[in-house]
Amino acid sequence: MSSKVIIFDTTLRDGEQALQASLSVKEKLQIALSLEKCGIDIIEVGFPISSPGDFKSVQTISKKIKNSRICSLARCVEKDIEVAGDAMSSSDFFRIHIFLATSTLHMESKLRKNFDEIIDMAVSSVKKALRYTDDVEFSCEDASRTTMDNLCRIVEKLIKAGVKTINIPDTVGYTIPNELSNIIKNLFERVPNIHKSIISVHCHNDLGMAVGNSISAIQAGARQIEGTINGIGERAGNTALEEIIMAIKVREDILGVSTNIVHKEIYRTSQIISQICNMPIPANKAIVGSNAFAHSSGIHQDGVLKNRKNYEIMEPNTIGVKEVKLNLTSRSGRAAVKYYMDKMGYKDDDYDIDELYSAFLKLADKKGQVFDYDLEALAIFSKKQENAEYFYLKFFSVQSISNGLSTASVKLKCGKKVYTESSTTSNGPVDATYQALNKIINFPITLQKFQLVAKGKGKDALGQVDILVKYENRQFHGIGLATDIIESSAQAMINVLNNIWKSQQVNKKLKNLKKY
């Protein structure tokens, strides 16, 4: 049995079914190219019979992808198979993926056919697909609820007909790991020609067991895993491929298998798909979540700084994440504070760690999360100065008209002086407000992230805006909170401007100290 596990990605087919709006041809191509770069073996790019748009997407992607095998879905219908073959005809090598339900429930209530009819339909469709390609996969839909006798019977017939890959889907996410493992083991024990085909599994996550089921299937002999990046898909989603891939890599000692994946491309691919599909990745998502390599507990931070292996089972750069993330909160210890001071270039005798840590805890209790520039200010300035705000928004007004233009007027207090400015833009009221503010302060900043989160429900709910900007090769954060989205956006930018100003004052004081 091969020690290589084939990774079959269905983000563009099964994953897209979870989206509120279909992806454009250009967006699908961008995702497909990212998957190819990541080393995905099989990319299921669509269901071409479903719509002219899907046909065009499959056709376009087939012309561009060279290093991954293209695959399209088809029912056991001659026209489906013909259209799938035509859509991929420009590809040098492709797969047709046929499916048909095999469980008693589906046969009786959905298809209204007996099992002999199901076998005849399946075998006949495989023979038609083989006219277009020698790579045919067959999925026994709802296989996990199909009787073992029927499943063994149809699998044997399909392999005899020429199917190279037999897929065993847990279509409704009903199975638990030992059950799926037993199904795979039974197929190997009872189907005499089973070794002429690769056994695949396609698990859904309705009970949160998609990854666990897939791992158990590998241990039982399955050598293809189907899923999606970030686990997107109908209902509770599909097997998260990045989790399967890294489980195989990290626990190769137990599983004894490997993949063809370029691991350093995992994080980038995950981010691209999240952005294109407009599906944010939960912070606590395994492997690719923002907290996957973040540490907030003082004990954990100290342990990671001494040796990453204390609290990390894989190195962040393995999947393309640049560095470990230590969140500075009231739970952080001295080790994390010292780590950031060292990172900024300060030496131990530049500050008193006990005084700094005491001031840090008070600020962390107040702010929640502290950033490196906050620490720097605490180390240089007094507690009184730490709370000083140089910029204060005294007034703002926004007007948007039907031609798409927005005009913002702001009155900004800068120290003891007050300035008024206005700006008109076609990019919306938030951009107009930011441009008006920048006319006053004239900081060459670049907005890198803008995130709006509703705090509560209804018309009186608060909107929290979190922004991240780049100024002179350094990142600064800002948070604004108000019932009015424009106001919370403006306050977030004011927060950023004060953080930048505070950093500038630190630099000035450091320059003065160097003179003596």
Curated annotation (Swiss-Prot):
Gene3D superfamilies documented for this protein: 1.10.238.260, 3.30.160.270, Aldolase class I
Gene Ontology molecular-function annotations: 2-isopropylmalate synthase activity; acetyl-CoA C-acetyltransferase activity; manganese ion binding
Pfam families assigned to the protein according to its UniProt record, in alphabetical order: HCS_D2 (PF22617), HMGL-like (PF00682), LeuA_dimer (PF08502)
HAMAP family: LeuA_type1
Cofactor: Mn(2+)
EC number: 2.3.3.13
Subunit structure: Homodimer.
Name used for this protein in its record: 2-isopropylmalate synthase
InterPro entries: 2-IPM_HCS-like, 2-isopropylmalate_synth_dimer, AIPM/Hcit_synth_CS, Aldolase_TIM, LeuA/HCS_post-cat, LeuA_allosteric_dom_sf, LeuA_bact_synth, PYR_CT
Family note: Belongs to the alpha-IPM synthase/homocitrate synthase family. LeuA type 1 subfamily.
